[in-house]
Amino acid sequence: MRIHFFAFLIILSLVGCDGWQADVGKLVRKWNNQRTIDGNDIEKCIPDDGEQCTIQAGWNSTQVCEYVKCNDDNCEGGGYVLWTRYVECASSPAVRIILIITGVIYMLVLFIMVSSAADDFFSPSISSIVAHLRISESVAGVTFMAFGNGAPDVFGAIASVLSSPTPKADLALGELFGAGLFVTTMVLAVTIFTRPFKAEVFSSIRDIAFYLVALAFLAFCFVYYDHVEIWMPITFLGVYLIYVCTVILSQILHNRHKKDEEKVDEVKTVDTDSLEDDDDIYVSHGHHVLHAHEVMKMEAEIEAVEPLKTWSFRGVVHDFKEHLKPWPSMDEWDEMNIFQKVIAVLNTIPNFLFKLTIPHSEQPWSKPITLLQCLICPVFLLFCIQVCSISPFPNSPGLWMYGLILSVLLTAAVLFFTELHKEPPFYKSLISYAGFLMSIAWIYLISSEVVNVVTMLGVVSRVSHEVLGLTILAWSNSIGDLIADVSVAKQGYPRMAMAAAIGGQLFNLLIGFGLPFTIAKIQGKSISMIINPTYRLLMLFLAISLIFTLIAMFAQKYFLRRIHSYSLVFIYISFFVFIGLSLDDILVWN
């Protein structure tokens, strides 16, 4: 139990660091720009409005380029490749068009990569953790997946609030509302469409009820106050504390009920003739729902990789080849269609990098591979969250040095305290947590690059900030939620995906509003809270989507069918119809 507790704390703390990815990356790039720009260039800089990338209609290409260079903290999405700068500073219109097309193709490849990372590495790690801790799907959804999916939004809100001398609650909440509406409608709709399932009654009602209470409390604050009082964010933190206690209590009661059921031994006979007649048997392997032929392939692959007996150059090379090969087997290749073969070819290099940097709990023990991953993963994790060059203390080396020290310590521990041909105790359990952490890091690294491309498309198209925030930015910020939730749903955990979709956004709202504004009020900052018609519609349709899901669950006797997903999509489309009417002043909400 002690191992479970410390492993859980380590994962929560490190996954939380992933949330700083976009904002820390922006701050680091902005600081580097200020160091490299000389006095003459500073005069060329066109200041921004402090909130968004605002390009005026009358600017020429040189002014736009200088503005983007000086304000890449707002004009870029937080990744390493600065697409907005490349496009806006292109030497000719032809180069500009080529860069835009290249960016779109790059984004499509990134979608293939993030899908592979989620399906082949993130989901197996989640499955192993659920089996190891023996927790229900709903608890796993509102803990591991909620923290993993929600960390960027929460820490992004903290960074934006603390970096501003006069933070605005409506701007921070607008981002949380936009992501919340998209996830509770579109992401949940795709999850249900992927795998219709019977919802967990108590946990679903609990999550929706807490979410509606939080929205009602915010509506009360917006109606009667135009600024944030310190008791408001503290109340949100208190609500989240009550929510956590409710989750823990429900898990305790669930475990007791499960033990009572296990006391009753029921022996069920199986008709062997029916099994022989079944063309395609479904089995559970490592908590993944697999076809019989898939299990035979997996077992054949595992049996083909024999543990290394002695240290030899040829043996180590062969071990690397068997564990890190990024291409499918000949049997799998023959069964693929043309589209799948193209995807497999495009995914060859990414798959090799994934296997090199993400420990996999379903792979057999390999000491050389484990040594290599211990050496690479800590520093690569810092690279993913863009903090390698950050110095934690004055006059201290960057975090990359501390990561390198950790790599050496882990490598030495594996080298001296494990055997070559024998898997150490607790290896599968520990490797599941490490795989979860590294797959989350990869998903956020890829998602940040997608956000960069999407932000570039938004800046180039010159759409309004409200439309950009409600569409492109909301969608791009929720890519990780969409990929992770759909992935675990396909692997046989749709209830976990639903719990993550609703519970994760509840976590974002309660902590994303409660924590940063509590800190800001303690610092003595004045925080305005004036809601505009767009945010009112956001809150209204977010409440409508939650109430509809609650009522539809009872109407369908808790089995969520595809008609439910169609209805959620209709709600989301209706929201944009009302937004369009509001922006055109056809619908006026004073």
Swiss-Prot record:
Keywords: Antiport, Calcium, Calcium transport, Ion transport, Membrane, Signal, Sodium, Sodium transport, Transmembrane, Transmembrane helix, Transport
Organism: Caenorhabditis elegans
GO cellular component, one term: membrane
Signal sequence, start to end: 1-19
Subcellular location, record wording: Membrane
Gene transcribed to yield this protein: ncx-6
Family classification: Belongs to the Ca(2+):cation antiporter (CaCA) (TC 2.A.19) family.
Principal subcellular localization: membrane
The keyword Ribosomal protein belongs to this UniProt entry's keyword annotation: no
Membrane topology designation: Multi-pass membrane protein
Alphabetical GO biological process terms: intracellular calcium ion homeostasis; monoatomic cation transport
One MF term in the entry's GO annotations: calcium:sodium antiporter activity
Protein name: Putative sodium/calcium exchanger 6
Pfam family, one: Na_Ca_ex
Transmembrane feature ranges: 97-117, 139-159, 173-193, 208-228, 230-250, 368-388, 397-417, 440-460, 499-519, 535-555, 568-588
